[in-house]
């Protein structure tokens, strides 16, 4: 969108609206500005309906203030890791990590790289198990 580089997190922002009776009255008309992935929707919606979320191990209830905010994305060129404090993009071609938001911090970059790699490895291993 808007000629943005699809490797950058700004190209991944999507505005969503929740409508209907499942949403708690206390949340109606509210803006929820939390970082999440589309796979977080099942846990969020099922929690609103007081239904179990255990079958959706990759999902988190973003309406729960204790839920850790992060988003992951990948394409043929990169792996992106988005947190409230920093956004990182790992380039497959160059093998480098680019910090796109936040204070430059090599320790933070390495921690984010480890988290993103662990997430991707676990995701891939789960996929292979199907």
Can you annotate each of these PLM segments?
Residues 1-130:
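Solvent-exposed soluble domains appended to multi-pass membrane proteins
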């Amino acid at each position: 969108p808007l000629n943005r580089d699809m490797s950058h997190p700004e190209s991944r922002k999507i505005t969503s609206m929740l409508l209907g009776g499942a949403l708690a009255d206390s949340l109606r008309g509210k803006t929820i500005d939390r970082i999440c992935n589309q796979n977080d929707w099942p846990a969020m919606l099922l929690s609103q309906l007081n239904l179990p979320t255990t079958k959706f191990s990759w999902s988190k209830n973003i309406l729960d203030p204790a839920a850790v905010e992060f988003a992951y994305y990948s394409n043929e060129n990169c792996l992106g890791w988005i947190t409230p404090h920093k956004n990182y993009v790992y380039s497959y071609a160059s093998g480098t990590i680019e910090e796109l938001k936040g204070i430059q911090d090599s320790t933070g970059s390495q921690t984010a790289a480890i988290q993103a790699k662990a997430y991707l490895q676990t995701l891939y291993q789960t996929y292979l198990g199907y």
